[in-house]
Amino acid sequence: MLPDAVSCVVILKIRGQEPRLCLSREYRYPAGHFLLSVPAGLLDPEDATEENPVFHAAARELREETGITLEESDSIRLVNPLVFSTPGMTDESNALVQIILNREEMPKVSQEGAVGTECFDGFLLLTQEEAQKILKDGVDDQGFFYPLYTWAALMCFATGMWK
């Protein structure tokens, strides 16, 4: 069974620098404001024809939402193949994927690849300490609550589970 969507925990490991968790501010229409988000999106029909549909969708979403293309030095792994978002209300499911970008220098990030109604307002490149603070506070640096998949990414990064 394939999930409906993929959500990505994206960690930047730049030589000589502290690792960073890459999150964005994405406008979420039901919430009525920008929320701290991970690169994520639906699996498209063409993803299903690929050898690994989930990884194909994750690479596409990374490119669309951050402008970053996976390179040979990067790693991608499945954290969870199928997580139900709110099984009491909907059958929506996501695969949770971890992407580690192993780079010599910081890649250029861009939200120019947004499609449809996607609307972004910048990135946060969090240190482990900053991720822990957001988790402890229960809200982002602007006082907004964040989605469950953002919480999962923060937990994965803040606890060192990604290593």
Regions found by a protein language model. Give the residues of each.
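Nudix hydrolase/Nudix homology domain
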Residues: 34, 39-41, 79, 89-90, ...
